[in-house]
């Protein structure tokens, strides 16, 4: 293909993402687009086609971004090349959205005709506007009995500030409005304008490990071209490789002779070293490199930390390999080695939220056959010591002793909650219970309110989202961002079994709830830990002060069953012997702690507040 033909092809490329709140119908819309452009036959079609992970289908959510190439025959008689990137909608995966948008010129904004604009809709639109993308608004689910497209059109204009007079009215389920939307993409989304003759410059926006081909990079070519046989350099790590294969996903991988500026596809180069490839890095030609790399992504800081331990310590290295491979595909995951007296060797992992943590754990168990123990999640505290130094503590067992601490600062988030008028009281009550500070409240229209609170992150990560949904019958939506740290009256609570601290059960709590929480956990552990042949005391302690205690009663073998009842001396002797044996057993006996005990620390909030 000569340069002129390439330029003509480039004018016909449209790169766009679909962004929306959870459950507003992104994946169904993507399915209809694939059908409409004959990318997949009716026989191959299945729901959530782009959600290729088994976990995504089961939960009905999108976790990973996914890029496909489609060909659309427009009304002007031309054939256009669409690169569609499907994105997740849940707040935990907003990092995936920002990565997708960096590879696009346009975004299709899907808004539910019944629910209207929600918190995550706003968050994702702002991400798109930050990247100067052309936005095509689509009001989906107009076939629902409760749909009110005109109200939603007004909301898009008032709340987001977009012109919605041209908004497409669609029903992805019934295939209504899909063609009109595709025509709007052709008209409104600009073609990529990268220089075809410049040195290669491509953005890595995703990667996955393949046992046979090594690391497969998903790239958006910004300038220049790349073909098999080219020598490439990854600008961040400086590593150089020879390209083995390039191609596009449609949705199955299709080999191509080359990828040019504007294309979104994949590249393999027998990359075996996982550390060389970072999402957000720039790929360039090793013999004719570009002067400066592309601006990558803003790094996402983990919000929640948890320990992951293999149940069999011999599997420690397997867990490391599994985490490294997962990190390729999930750039927001962080991990570092740690040891626990109770659980042995494992990793302290950082996640964007509880759903993210849940998904990572499930992927490790399914895709890598790992058997794991997970400790209760915690956040990073900024601890100021009496000598004036500051340390960051994300593992409760690393918290210094009380006399050494001058002050503990805990991270806060600014939470934006969109909620119907009728449920404002319930939301405010929940936020107060979670130690939230009221900031402001805006009425978006006659039906809905945007409530803003500052809440400690540690209160959000447990069950805030579930409680919010249940107290508003599922109508409230939440978006949050970190908002610095504030001093708090926090204490570390240790759990002692048979007099020994179990470091993995330690947790940090506000002093106000410490006693109640210690009591609940002690009682809960009593029901979870199996009985032994000796009595086990379970204690909760702040420093040396015991704040709650209970005992697990010992099994009792009836040693007097075989003797004659009329021999009190013999009876007393046997009972005394049993007592001495149990005392000895108690001194050397260790207590096995089941996985459920570590999760019990999580579930205590319920019973306290």
Curated annotation (Swiss-Prot):
Coiled coil: none
GO cellular component terms given for this protein: plasma membrane
Catalytic activity from the UniProt record: GTP + H2O = GDP + phosphate + H(+)
UniProt: GTP binding residues: 23-28, 140-143
Pfam families: EFG_C, GTP_EFTU, GTP_EFTU_D2, LepA_C
PANTHER family according to UniProt: TRANSLATION FACTOR GUF1 HOMOLOG, CHLOROPLASTIC, TRANSLATION FACTOR GUF1-RELATED
Species annotation: Ligilactobacillus salivarius (strain UCC118) (Lactobacillus salivarius)
Protein name: Elongation factor 4
Keyword annotations: Cell membrane, GTP-binding, Hydrolase, Membrane, Nucleotide-binding, Protein biosynthesis
Species lineage: Bacteria, Bacillati, Bacillota, Bacilli, Lactobacillales
UniProt key word Protein biosynthesis: yes
Molecular function in Gene Ontology: GTP binding; GTPase activity; ribosome binding; translation elongation factor activity
Domain tr-type G, residue spans: 11-193
Enzyme Commission code(s) on record: 3.6.5.n1
Family statement: Belongs to the TRAFAC class translation factor GTPase superfamily. Classic translation factor GTPase family. LepA subfamily.
SMART domains in UniProt: EFG_C
Cited SUPFAM superfamilies: EF-G C-terminal domain-like, P-loop containing nucleoside triphosphate hydrolases, Translation proteins
Principal subcellular localization: membrane
Function (record text): Required for accurate and efficient protein synthesis under certain stress conditions. May act as a fidelity factor of the translation reaction, by catalyzing a one-codon backward translocation of tRNAs on improperly translocated ribosomes. Back-translocation proceeds from a post-translocation (POST) complex to a pre-translocation (PRE) complex, thus giving elongation factor G a second chance to translocate the tRNAs correctly. Binds to ribosomes in a GTP-dependent manner.
Subcellular location: Cell membrane
GO biological process: positive regulation of translation
Topology of the protein relative to the lipid bilayer: Peripheral membrane protein
Keyword Lyase: no
